[in-house]
């Protein structure tokens, strides 16, 4: 293991830069914090570049696994002050890993998600986690959607991000030409979601927290669906609605 004693170190500067979207895109890299997430990442095909641990980090079995994967020279030890300067969490567990972003892969699922301009990192992370738990491994996103590799989104996925393929949606007609039926979650002129998911290949659109799905995507959808509600609430949080609809699509 290597000991780093200055915030001027190139690895420290890199991790600090990865807190900003433009540098994540520039370097095609992102980072994650937390023991559980990093353990899960070891089961994926994401390339881990290096790990930073706080000097009081105690999980020796995880350190051993990381040394086997990366070599000792890519395990970097920091004192508490330097580690705190790069940590994105209030109560860090003392470990940060840096990864290469994975290039888009071929669609592997008959059931897909499309995120349309969703902004809240917590919502996106929860949706990713829910989708992966039902074996949805490809998620499309439109321009205006928050960065799925931002630290808050990555942490909120609780490790599910390492098992999902992310693709920017350029033209929904391409999905339709490949046999996918498009389901738009909206309130107007919509049918009940309980019995709506009847196609073999389906793509579910979840829309922006405030304005919902864009008119263009709604117009190109094959079915408009809504969740039956019996109480007084007029709508649900997008992550909550997404969980219900993902379950109904996959059951």
Q: Would you name each region that the model predicts?
A:
Residues 1-58, 145-146:
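Boundary-proximal intrinsically disordered activation/regulatory segments immediately upstream
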Residues 3-5, 76-79, 164-171:
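Short acidic-hydrophobic, aromatic-tinged amphipathic segments that line or gate anion-handling sites
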Residues 60-70, 217:
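Short, aromatic/basic amphipathic alpha-helical patches
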Residues 75-96:
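Glycine/small-residue-rich loop that forms an oxyanion/phosphate-binding "nest" at active or ligand-binding sites
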Residues 98, 106-189:
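RNA substrate-binding interface of SAM-dependent RNA methyltransferases
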Residues 185-233:
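Active-site/ligand-binding-proximal alpha/beta "capping" segment
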């Amino acid at each position: 293991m290597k000991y780093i004693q200055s915030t001027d170190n190139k690895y420290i500067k890199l991790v600090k830069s990865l807190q900003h979207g433009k540098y994540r895109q520039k370097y095609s890299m992102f980072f994650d914090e937390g023991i559980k997430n990093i353990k899960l990442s070891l089961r994926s095909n994401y390339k881990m570049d290096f790990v930073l641990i706080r000097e009081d980090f105690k999980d020796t079995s995880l350190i051993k696994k990381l040394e086997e994967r990366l070599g000792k020279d890519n395990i970097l030890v920091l004192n508490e002050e330097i580690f705190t300067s790069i940590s994105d969490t209030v109560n860090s567990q003392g470990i940060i890993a840096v990864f290469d972003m994975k290039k888009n892969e071929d669609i592997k699922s008959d059931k897909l998600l499309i995120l349309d301009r969703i902004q809240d990192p917590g919502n996106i992370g929860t949706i990713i986690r829910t989708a992966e738990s039902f074996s949805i491994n490809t998620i499309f996103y439109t321009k205006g959607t928050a960065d799925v590799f931002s630290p808050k989104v990555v942490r909120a996925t609780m490790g599910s991000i390492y098992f999902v393929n992310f693709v920017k949606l350029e033209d929904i007609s391409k999905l339709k030409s490949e046999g996918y039926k498009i389901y738009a979650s909206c309130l107007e002129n919509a049918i009940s979601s309980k019995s709506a998911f009847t196609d073999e290949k389906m793509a579910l659109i979840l829309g922006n927290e405030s304005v919902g799905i864009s008119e263009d995507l709604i117009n190109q959808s094959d079915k408009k669906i809504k969740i039956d509600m019996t109480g007084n609430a007029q709508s649900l949080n997008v992550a909550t609605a997404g969980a219900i609809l993902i379950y109904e699509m996959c059951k």
